[in-house]
Amino acid sequence: MARKKAALDFEQSLADLQTLVERLENGELSLEDSLTAFEQGIGLTRDCQAALAQAEQKVQVLLERDGELAEEPFDADQPE
């Protein structure tokens, strides 16, 4: 369940980031609102980067065999 929550948090952060980018690109925000949106976007970007880094580390741990890291391409369609 924790894995699903983390995935949902990442997906929600990514969706929120996309919304902020669209609002900024639209150009209808005031300078103050643009700065606030930019700050929120930076926070969301950092959250997403941290989640991706954590997932990458978990993949490396799962692939580690006999003390050696087995480099394998990621296949999203492959079942666990």
UniProtKB/Swiss-Prot annotation:
GO terms for molecular function: exodeoxyribonuclease VII activity. InterPro entries: Exonuc_VII_S, Exonuc_VII_ssu_sf. One of its GO terms (cellular component) is cytosol. It catalyses: Exonucleolytic cleavage in either 5'- to 3'- or 3'- to 5'-direction to yield nucleoside 5'-phosphates. It comes from the Bacteria. Keywords: Cytoplasm, Exonuclease, Hydrolase, Nuclease. GO terms for biological process: DNA catabolic process. It is found in: Cytoplasm. Its EC number is 3.1.11.6. HAMAP family: Exonuc_7_S. Bidirectionally degrades single-stranded DNA into large acid-insoluble oligonucleotides, which are then degraded further into small acid-soluble oligonucleotides. Belongs to the XseB family. Heterooligomer composed of large and small subunits. This is Exodeoxyribonuclease 7 small subunit. It comes from Pseudomonas fluorescens (strain Pf0-1).
